[in-house]
Protein backbone atom coordinates (compact mmCIF):
# COMPACT_ATOMS: atom_id res chain seq x y z
CA UNK A 1 0.00 0.00 0.00
CA UNK A 2 1.30 3.45 -0.91
CA UNK A 3 0.27 6.89 0.35
CA UNK A 4 1.93 9.57 -1.71
CA UNK A 5 5.60 8.63 -1.91
CA UNK A 6 5.43 6.46 1.23
CA UNK A 7 5.26 2.68 0.81
CA UNK A 8 3.71 0.92 3.82
CA UNK A 9 4.83 -2.55 4.90
CA UNK A 10 1.20 -3.60 5.32
CA UNK A 11 -2.31 -2.07 5.20
CA UNK A 12 -2.86 -2.09 8.98
CA UNK A 13 -3.30 1.55 9.93
CA UNK A 14 -3.85 2.73 13.48
CA UNK A 15 -6.74 5.20 13.55
CA UNK A 16 -6.02 8.54 15.21
CA UNK A 17 -7.98 8.72 18.47
CA UNK A 18 -7.82 11.63 20.92
CA UNK A 19 -6.89 10.42 24.38
CA UNK A 20 -5.86 7.00 23.06
CA UNK A 21 -3.11 7.11 20.43
CA UNK A 22 -0.42 8.63 22.62
CA UNK A 23 3.25 7.71 22.23
CA UNK A 24 3.25 4.55 24.42
CA UNK A 25 0.12 3.21 22.70
CA UNK A 26 1.59 3.87 19.25
CA UNK A 27 4.78 2.01 20.17
CA UNK A 28 2.70 -0.93 21.39
CA UNK A 29 0.76 -0.97 18.10
CA UNK A 30 4.04 -0.85 16.16
CA UNK A 31 5.24 -3.91 18.10
CA UNK A 32 2.01 -5.65 17.10
CA UNK A 33 2.61 -4.94 13.42
CA UNK A 34 0.83 -1.70 12.51
CA UNK A 35 1.91 -0.51 9.07
CA UNK A 36 1.17 3.15 9.85
CA UNK A 37 0.78 4.85 13.21
CA UNK A 38 -1.39 7.93 13.68
CA UNK A 39 -0.98 10.51 16.40
CA UNK A 40 -3.73 12.14 18.44
CA UNK A 41 -5.31 15.15 16.74
CA UNK A 42 -3.56 18.46 17.36
CA UNK A 43 -5.16 21.88 17.08
CA UNK A 44 -3.60 24.11 14.43
CA UNK A 45 -4.59 27.12 16.57
CA UNK A 46 -2.88 25.61 19.62
CA UNK A 47 0.28 25.27 17.53
CA UNK A 48 -0.06 28.88 16.42
CA UNK A 49 -0.32 30.06 20.03
CA UNK A 50 2.50 27.70 21.09
CA UNK A 51 0.31 25.99 23.68
CA UNK A 52 2.58 24.12 26.14
CA UNK A 53 0.29 21.07 26.33
CA UNK A 54 0.48 20.68 22.57
CA UNK A 55 4.24 20.14 22.70
CA UNK A 56 3.66 16.79 24.45
CA UNK A 57 1.38 15.68 21.60
CA UNK A 58 4.16 16.38 19.08
CA UNK A 59 6.54 13.82 20.62
CA UNK A 60 7.63 11.20 18.09
CA UNK A 61 9.89 8.25 18.92
CA UNK A 62 12.37 7.01 16.26
CA UNK A 63 10.88 3.48 16.47
CA UNK A 64 7.43 4.60 15.36
CA UNK A 65 8.21 5.03 11.68
CA UNK A 66 6.05 5.61 9.70
CA UNK A 67 3.75 7.95 11.59
CA UNK A 68 1.00 10.36 10.57
CA UNK A 69 0.47 13.64 12.39
CA UNK A 70 -3.15 14.81 12.46
CA UNK A 71 -4.15 18.47 12.62
CA UNK A 72 -7.60 19.92 13.07
CA UNK A 73 -8.87 23.40 12.35
CA UNK A 74 -11.03 25.39 9.97
CA UNK A 75 -8.73 28.19 8.82
CA UNK A 76 -6.75 27.14 5.74
CA UNK A 77 -4.08 29.77 6.36
CA UNK A 78 -3.46 28.78 9.98
CA UNK A 79 -3.42 25.06 9.14
CA UNK A 80 -0.96 25.57 6.26
CA UNK A 81 1.32 27.91 8.21
CA UNK A 82 1.50 25.60 11.21
CA UNK A 83 2.03 22.51 9.06
CA UNK A 84 4.92 24.30 7.34
CA UNK A 85 6.34 25.30 10.74
CA UNK A 86 6.40 21.69 12.03
CA UNK A 87 7.23 19.96 8.76
CA UNK A 88 10.77 19.21 9.94
CA UNK A 89 9.44 16.93 12.69
CA UNK A 90 9.91 13.23 11.89
CA UNK A 91 6.37 12.43 10.73
CA UNK A 92 5.77 11.11 7.23
CA UNK A 93 2.14 12.10 6.54
CA UNK A 94 0.02 15.06 7.56
CA UNK A 95 -3.66 14.21 8.08
CA UNK A 96 -6.54 16.66 8.42
CA UNK A 97 -9.29 15.70 10.84
CA UNK A 98 -12.71 16.15 9.24
CA UNK A 99 -14.40 13.55 11.41
CA UNK A 100 -14.24 14.56 15.08
CA UNK A 101 -17.84 14.73 16.40
CA UNK A 102 -17.08 16.41 19.75
CA UNK A 103 -19.25 19.53 20.29
CA UNK A 104 -16.39 21.83 21.34
CA UNK A 105 -14.61 21.03 18.05
CA UNK A 106 -17.72 21.11 15.83
CA UNK A 107 -18.98 24.44 17.21
CA UNK A 108 -15.80 26.07 15.87
CA UNK A 109 -16.45 24.72 12.38
CA UNK A 110 -13.72 22.10 12.81
CA UNK A 111 -13.68 18.29 12.69
CA UNK A 112 -16.89 16.82 11.27
CA UNK A 113 -18.36 20.33 10.81
CA UNK A 114 -16.16 20.52 7.70
CA UNK A 115 -18.38 17.84 6.14
CA UNK A 116 -20.96 20.62 5.73
CA UNK A 117 -18.57 22.92 3.88
CA UNK A 118 -17.15 21.35 0.69
CA UNK A 119 -15.59 24.63 -0.52
CA UNK A 120 -13.64 24.97 2.72
CA UNK A 121 -12.50 21.34 2.45
CA UNK A 122 -11.04 22.16 -0.97
CA UNK A 123 -9.34 25.32 0.33
CA UNK A 124 -7.80 23.58 3.34
CA UNK A 125 -6.46 20.60 1.39
CA UNK A 126 -5.23 22.56 -1.65
CA UNK A 127 -3.43 25.18 0.46
CA UNK A 128 -1.87 22.49 2.64
CA UNK A 129 -0.66 20.48 -0.36
CA UNK A 130 1.01 23.63 -1.72
CA UNK A 131 2.56 24.51 1.66
CA UNK A 132 4.30 21.23 2.52
CA UNK A 133 6.12 18.45 0.70
CA UNK A 134 4.80 15.54 2.77
CA UNK A 135 1.68 13.64 1.66
CA UNK A 136 -1.60 15.13 2.88
CA UNK A 137 -4.50 12.86 3.84
CA UNK A 138 -7.97 13.45 5.28
CA UNK A 139 -10.18 11.58 7.71
CA UNK A 140 -13.88 12.06 7.02
CA UNK A 141 -17.22 10.62 8.11
CA UNK A 142 -20.19 9.21 6.23
CA UNK A 143 -21.71 12.68 6.54
CA UNK A 144 -22.80 15.16 9.16
CA UNK A 145 -26.21 13.57 9.72
CA UNK A 146 -28.66 11.32 7.87
CA UNK A 147 -29.86 14.29 5.82
CA UNK A 148 -26.32 15.11 4.70
CA UNK A 149 -24.61 11.91 3.54
CA UNK A 150 -21.78 13.29 1.41
CA UNK A 151 -18.66 11.20 2.03
CA UNK A 152 -18.24 10.45 -1.69
CA UNK A 153 -18.51 14.14 -2.61
CA UNK A 154 -16.06 15.22 0.10
CA UNK A 155 -13.60 12.45 -0.84
CA UNK A 156 -13.66 13.53 -4.49
CA UNK A 157 -13.10 17.16 -3.48
CA UNK A 158 -10.18 16.18 -1.24
CA UNK A 159 -8.66 14.11 -4.03
CA UNK A 160 -9.11 16.95 -6.53
CA UNK A 161 -7.41 19.31 -4.06
CA UNK A 162 -4.40 16.99 -3.87
CA UNK A 163 -5.01 14.62 -0.96
CA UNK A 164 -2.98 11.41 -1.24
CA UNK A 165 -5.51 9.29 0.67
CA UNK A 166 -8.90 9.45 2.38
CA UNK A 167 -9.94 7.52 5.49
CA UNK A 168 -13.66 7.08 6.10
CA UNK A 169 -15.45 6.57 9.41
CA UNK A 170 -18.66 4.84 8.34
CA UNK A 171 -20.89 6.77 10.74
CA UNK A 172 -22.35 10.27 10.68
CA UNK A 173 -21.38 12.96 13.14
CA UNK A 174 -24.86 12.56 14.60
CA UNK A 175 -24.08 8.90 15.42
CA UNK A 176 -20.80 9.72 17.16
CA UNK A 177 -19.35 6.24 17.80
CA UNK A 178 -22.56 4.26 18.27
CA UNK A 179 -24.76 2.29 15.91
CA UNK A 180 -23.56 0.25 13.00
CA UNK A 181 -20.90 1.53 10.65
CA UNK A 182 -22.02 1.82 7.03
CA UNK A 183 -19.59 -0.39 5.14
CA UNK A 184 -21.35 0.39 1.87
CA UNK A 185 -20.44 4.10 2.04
CA UNK A 186 -16.82 3.11 2.60
CA UNK A 187 -17.00 0.92 -0.53
CA UNK A 188 -18.57 3.81 -2.47
CA UNK A 189 -15.76 6.16 -1.47
CA UNK A 190 -13.13 3.56 -2.37
CA UNK A 191 -14.68 3.14 -5.81
CA UNK A 192 -14.97 6.91 -6.35
CA UNK A 193 -11.39 7.96 -5.55
Explain the meaning of each model-derived region.
Residues 1-193:
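Flavin-dependent oxidoreductase catalytic cores
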